[in-house]
Amino acid sequence: MFTLKIVVYTTVTFFVSLFTFGFLSNDASRNPNRKDLE
């Protein structure tokens, strides 16, 4: 049960960070200098 909670928290954190990164890099994609995606 504890391992399941760890997996759930890791997945949620991963998707939240992925959504945040995609939302932030959306503005950077209009920028020609994309040094943060390297």
Swiss-Prot record:
Protein's membrane topology: Single-pass membrane protein
TM segment ranges: 6-25
Known role: One of the components of the core complex of photosystem II (PSII), required for its stability and/or assembly. PSII is a light-driven water:plastoquinone oxidoreductase that uses light energy to abstract electrons from H(2)O, generating O(2) and a proton gradient subsequently used for ATP formation. It consists of a core antenna complex that captures photons, and an electron transfer chain that converts photonic excitation into a charge separation.
InterPro entries the record matches: PSII_PsbI, PSII_PsbI_sf
Domain of life: Eukaryota
Organism: Guillardia theta (Cryptophyte)
SUPFAM superfamilies: Photosystem II reaction center protein I, PsbI
Name this protein carries in UniProt: Photosystem II reaction center protein I
NCBIfam families associated with the record: PRK02655.1
Alphabetical UniProt keywords: Chloroplast, Membrane, Photosynthesis, Photosystem II, Plastid, Reaction center, Thylakoid, Transmembrane, Transmembrane helix
GO cellular component, one term: chloroplast thylakoid membrane
Quaternary data: PSII is composed of 1 copy each of membrane proteins PsbA, PsbB, PsbC, PsbD, PsbE, PsbF, PsbH, PsbI, PsbJ, PsbK, PsbL, PsbM, PsbT, PsbX, PsbY, PsbZ, Psb30/Ycf12, at least 3 peripheral proteins of the oxygen-evolving complex and a large number of cofactors. It forms dimeric complexes.
Pfam families: PsbI
Family stated for the protein in its record: Belongs to the PsbI family.
Subcellular location(s) of the protein: Plastid, Chloroplast thylakoid membrane
GO BP terms in the entry: photosynthesis
HAMAP family reported in the protein's UniProt record: PSII_PsbI
